[in-house]
Structures are given as C-alpha cells and as structure tokens.
Amino acid sequence: MAQHNAFYAQSGGVTAVINASACGVIEACRRHDDRIGKVYAGHNGIIGALTEDLIDVSQESDEAIAALRHTPAGAFGSCRYKLKDIETHRTQYERLIEVFRAHDIRYFFYNGGGDSADTCLKVSQLSEKMGYPLTAIHVPKTVDNDLPITDNSPGFGSVAKYIATSTLEASLDIASMCATSTKVFVLEVMGRHAGWIAAAGALAGQGEGDPPHLVIFPEIDFDRAAVMARVEESVKKCGYCVIVVSEGARYEDGTFLADSGNTDAFGHRQLGGVAPTLAGMIKQDLGYKYHWAVADYLQRAARHLASKTDVDQAYAVGEKAVELALDGQNAKMPAIKRISDEPYAWTVEAAPLADVANREKFMPRDFIREDGFGITEQCRRYLAPLIQGEDFPPFENGLPKVAKLAKHRVERKLPEFKL
C-alpha cells in the first residue's frame, strides 16, 4: 500500500505521561512503515501546524523515542491555543489542511483534552468537505480526569498518586508539629470544575479520623460556616486539620473562592489561589496557625512518582490511536474501558469524537460522602487501581534521566501564516 505521512501534536496542559502517549504513537507508526512514511510533530502543538513549524520525528533514534516513555512534560512543546468556531475562523482550519496537503500528511493525531477533541473533530469534518483524505484521531490526555466516555484519562493516575502521597507525607509533618506549632495545613490541587484530583487526596486516609480531614470539591457548594465547624472539630479531636481543596471550589452562586477576574486562551476563568484564601478564612474565623501549599505544576510533572497503571494506559491509547487510523476509523478517540475493579482489568476501545468534544465528566454525587467533605467507598474502589504500580525512570547523577531530542525542522513549503 502507498505510504503517507503522519502528524502528531500535544495540546493544553502537559502531564507526567503525555510523552508516553507520544511514544506509543511514534513506535506504532514505525511498526507500520509500509503504510506510514514520516512522522511529523507540531512544534508547540497545533501552532506548529498553522505556522508550518514541523519537527521531523523520523530522524530521532529509537532510543530517544523510547526515552519519551519516562520523560514528563511535552517533548515537542504544547500550547493553549484554541481554534475558534469553524464558520467564523475557517481560514485557520483551511490552513491546517493546506499544510497537511503540502507535506502529504494523511494521519492526524491530536493529544489533549476536551477542547482538543473538539478541534480534532472539526478538522475531520472540514477535511471531508474539502475533499482531502485525512484520518483524525484524538489521543486522550488530561490530569483533570474530566473527559467523558473513557473510564479515566491518561495523566490523572499519576497526579492522583502524587497528591495522595503528598497528602500522606505532609499529614505526618503536621501531626509532628501540631502541639506547639501549625494546626492547619491546606493543599490546593488542580481541578477547575471536577474534583477528581482532590478526591485522590482522600486515598491517603485508610481509617476513620485519618487525614485529610476535609476534601473540598467544586461539585459541592462551599459553605463557610460548615467548613469552619469541621476544621474546629478536627483540631479539637486530632490536634490538627489537613485539608485538600480543589482550585475550582465555589460558592452556591457559582463564584470561585479564588476568582482572579481574568480568563485564559480557552476562555476559562483564571483562578488566583484558593489555598491562601481558605487559610486566611480559617485564621480570621478560628485563629489557628496554618501553612498552605499549591501543588501546581509539581503535581503534573512528577514522573518520578508516576503510576505504572497510568504510564501503561498512556502508551496504550497512543498505540491504539494508530491502529484505529490504519483501520480507517476517522474522528475517533481510544477510550479506556474498565473490565473489573478486583482484579483491576481494562482494555482500550474506540469512542466517537462527537460524544467526547466539549463535554465534561464530573464527580458523581454518590462518590462524595453525604457531608460533602470526603469520598465514599465506591469512589475509593474507582480511584485505588489508578495509582497502583511504580514505573521509576532511570537515574543519572542522582537525577531522573530524560529524553533529549534533536528536533530537526522540516523545510517550509507554504507562505508565512499569521496567527
């Protein structure tokens, strides 16, 4: 069969395992070199396609590509750049098709979250209208775990493991010092609309009274009086209180506790730090000495503590994306399907992008305790397998060894395009 080229791009916030998906895509393409010629990657995501800034991944060694599996962040560069509505910004989509046509790219693998799924779907639709034979596959990725259809999202399991571990270790620290020093510790985690990462912090507690004593979810309206009462109860009973709070914690009217008033490139509200906001409330209302921390980029970059389950799944969806494309399944996403909890078993199936794009999966109410401050056993059964297993990177000079890519650029064939 005729050879055609493939294009891969990373989108949005990166994770500890998105490069494992890249590894899965690239290695699968190399195994099918009778049908796929060169593999190009967009420098800084979809912007690389629009500006024709392409990296020739085919020139990277097998060893360098294999090292992507244990390298965090986005090896080819990512971006927060959302292609707008196709009717009013058609030129951007047409530009993508022009670049793909110029470089004989027939396979488009877009690795990202919900917004990326929407872009992938639109590109697929426009290429069909323009008569260009393009197969577009979305490769799932998001630490927020809010993609629908898939049982869980690659990237989440490793963040969950990091947050659960950090909560456990910080709790021991606070417990050691609470008699004469800090009484309250607040850990802020990612999760704008969905509280999956905050929920993972609850895995640190194995029995009644174990920290974290409060988990604050975006799905539960923030009640200041109720929160303060629970904090005070915990300090009186245990001597200290550990709180895991989602960055998206909000009041009943939908206002974020830490709304900065700004928006990002995707139109999402930018949040200004719920941990110091909540800690300040506790100091004002109860007078307790506190410390707070924001996990921020650390939680999604911690490849040294990645979940093996997450690494395996991230690689598998990348690999499956290529299989779907070669099978002619256009506008699809490889989705993880859970077969059983104990023993944990899973597989990867194809999901229509139309069912994924611009939809969010929130914490079910029966995953959150009735009082709103913790997780249920049902939630624990769901989360526990996702943090299982260790997949340590190789170390050199005491530090993790990461992939070093040559990133040879492809010669441009088209006129310059202004974003």
Curated annotation (Swiss-Prot):
**Cofactors named for this entry:** Mg(2+)
The answer to keyword Kinase applying to this record is yes
Spell out the subunit comment: Homodimer.
What protein name applies here? Pyrophosphate--fructose 6-phosphate 1-phosphotransferase
Q: Which GO terms describe its cellular component?
A: cytoplasm
Provide the catalytic activity annotation. beta-D-fructose 6-phosphate + diphosphate = beta-D-fructose 1,6-bisphosphate + phosphate + H(+)
Q: Report the GO molecular function annotations.
A: 6-phosphofructokinase activity; diphosphate-fructose-6-phosphate 1-phosphotransferase activity; metal ion binding
GO BP terms in the entry: fructose 6-phosphate metabolic process
Catalytic residues per the record?
Answer: 144
Kindly give the PANTHER family that the UniProt entry links to this protein: ATP-DEPENDENT 6-PHOSPHOFRUCTOKINASE 1
Q: Where is this site: Important for catalytic activity?
A: 141
Taxonomic classification: Bacteria, Pseudomonadati, Pseudomonadota, Gammaproteobacteria, Oceanospirillales
| Class of enzymatic activity (EC top level) | transferase
Q: In which pathway does it act?
A: Carbohydrate degradation; glycolysis; D-glyceraldehyde 3-phosphate and glycerone phosphate from D-glucose: step 3/4
Where is the protein found, in the record's own terms? Cytoplasm
User: Cross-referenced HAMAP family, in alphabetical order?
Assistant: Phosphofructokinase_II_B2
Which Pfam family, giving just one, matches this sequence? PFK
- Residue numbers for the site described as Important for catalytic activity and substrate specificity? 115
